[in-house]
Design a protein with these regions (language model features):
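Membrane-embedded and interfacial regions of multi-pass energy-transducing membrane proteins
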Residues: 1-282
């Protein structure tokens, strides 16, 4: 029987194939990281030749460099690219459990990254309150901070969709005979990482929505009373707690260090075990 010929768009752009989505993640993350690297170079040049960029621009470059490298670079490469490409292959699955969800995960990531970078074209520049987006500065910063928060909501949605997909794929689509104790170490690393993301990202998603409401609607979840800006008391409503944001942010950002390192350790462990021709001990 004749196979249905896929169009260019369905095969390469809106692909549902786990391998191609992994490649999309990797290539897109590489471009984002190159942009983040360029920001770092300009910041270093500013240190040598003071006055090259303004202090506000320097702050924006620092905030966006950190955001790009963590949320648009390393995590999408280590989880999105390697995870999507290798996990189904290592467990004998034909594809991820939810191919359309996988495609949606990538495009949420892409839209989130582009949304954040749009901040550079807005009046006042990109987000400039650090990659941690600490209030109260983040609550009174320029419009770039608003698009940073919108982009972060897309990125969190992407990570949650991808993590659920990896968990379900690993649990349900393992080839017959591949028991838990026979599971490749890299797959274990991706599985644990996915559980960490599913547990840690929702609080930041909620916090991002709250901070967006502080900026756009006029709430004061993180806006303290009596904030003095430019020698005058800020007119925004107070009563909120900047410390609450820090708790919610670091509920994600501390597990994030394990999200960054666990898949990398899984890759190194697989390579070492394969090359020395001995199974992992432990």
């Amino acid at each position: 029987s004749e196979h249905h010929q896929e169009s260019f768009w369905t095969k390469y752009v809106f692909s549902q194939d786990h391998k191609w989505i992994g490649i999309q993640y990797g290539v897109t993350a590489l471009f984002f990281m190159l942009f983040g690297f360029a920001l770092m170079i300009v910041m270093r040049y500013q240190m040598v030749h003071a006055g090259t960029i303004s202090p506000d621009t320097y702050n924006s470059f620092g905030a966006m460099h950190g955001t790009i490298m963590v949320f648009l670079g390393v995590v999408p490469v280590i989880v999105g690219a390697y995870g999507n490409y290798l996990v189904p292959l290592q467990i004998g699955a034909p594809d991820m459990a939810f191919p359309k969800l996988n495609m949606a995960s990538y495009w949420c990531y892409f839209l989130g990254g582009v949304t954040m970078l749009i901040g550079f074209a807005l009046p006042g520049g990109a987000a400039n309150s650090g990659w941690t987006s600490y209030p109260p500065l983040a609550n009174i910063a320029t419009t770039g901070q608003t698009v940073w928060l919108l982009g972060m909501l897309f990125l969190i949605a992407s990570s949650l969709l991808g993590s659920v997909n990896i968990i379900v794929t690993t649990v349900q689509l393992r080839v017959e005979g591949l028991t838990w104790m026979r599971l490749p170490f890299f797959v274990w690393a991706q599985l644990v990482t996915s559980f960490l993301l599913v547990l840690a990202f929702p609080p930041l998603q909620a916090a991002g929505i709250f901070q967006l409401m502080d900026r756009v609607v006029g709430t004061s979840f993180f806006m303290p009373s009596g904030l003095v800006v430019g020698g005058e008391v800020h007119a925004a409503a107070g009563g909120g707690s900047p410390l609450l944001w820090q708790h919610l942010f670091w509920f994600l950002a501390h597990p994030e260090v394990y999200v960054l390192i666990l898949p990398a350790m899984g890759i190194v462990a697989e390579i070492l075990a394969n090359n020395i021709r001995k199974p992992l001990w432990g």
